[in-house]
Amino acid sequence: MARYRCCRSQSQSRCRRRRRRRCRRRRRRSVRQRRVCCRRYTVLRCRRRR
């Protein structure tokens, strides 16, 4: 749910530039890293949603 919301909030150009491989690795690190993960994970949702 958080990934989807992040994707909608982020821009498509920004979503395309982010990566989702590092997000998976830094997923259970800290609450602050969770936001970064959402921004990087957004790439996968933005690309498949559009």
Curated annotation (Swiss-Prot):
It comes from Equus caballus (Horse). Its main location: nucleus. Belongs to the protamine P1 family. One of its GO terms (biological process) is sperm DNA condensation. Keywords: Chromosome, Developmental protein, Differentiation, Disulfide bond, DNA condensation, DNA-binding, Nucleosome core, Nucleus, Spermatogenesis. Protamines substitute for histones in the chromatin of sperm during the haploid phase of spermatogenesis. They compact sperm DNA into a highly condensed, stable and inactive complex. It is found in: Nucleus; Chromosome. Cross-linked by interchain disulfide bonds around the DNA-helix. This is Sperm protamine P1. One of its GO terms (cellular component) is nucleosome. Disulfide bonds join C7-C15, C38-C46. Testis. InterPro entries: Protamine_P1. The gene is PRM1. The keyword Disulfide bond applies. GO terms for molecular function: DNA binding.
